Amino acid sequence: MNLKSPKLFLSLIIVLVYGNTIFNSFHFDDIHSILEKPWIRGWDKIPQFIVSVFQRPLVILSFNLNYAISEFEVWSYHVFNVCFHIIASLLVFKLVQQIMFFLKDLSAKKYPPLFSWPYIAALVFALHPLSTQSVTYISSRSSILATIFYLSGLILFFKGFGERKFNKNPGHIYFFGSTFFFVLGGLTKEIIVTLPAALFLFHYYFISRESP
């Protein structure tokens, strides 16, 4: 294994930790959210839920895709959750990279990639017990997806200001992308409503202040 590829290393660790959950059965809310929900049983059902914000349509759409792959065989639902968790963890890696870039505290030359702060932060996020339910409990997929959109919005927000500061580019496309992910989050889980406040705080602490 190439230890200079922290993203690959992180992904493999997550697979090793959560790989034994792939055949865990449906539980609790999975019954009425998946097994008893007719909306996931075919692409023709998409128009019935895709316009309903209150039904978290993107989550249902992902279950619809699972049903197309394996119907009610549980393995594909768990594989999706693990893959989404890997994506979220890699986004944490990217976000902390951008924060450190603005703070100018770390550099690739000073710290090997495997031991960098971005990797440590992503590893803590990936393996922390608080993440367990969101990964192993299929109905908690809404939390993982909302986290992906949340982090993507933050990353593009940073990228937009990075373009302004270092490349003299207005960065409008990145700010539009951040807004787009905010909308996707709204179709996934209500926690996304805090994203504008997070953007304000990130701008205040990491962008508007000049590093010493």
Language-model segments: residues:
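Polytopic membrane enzymes that build or remodel cell-surface glycoconjugates and lipids
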Residues: 1-212
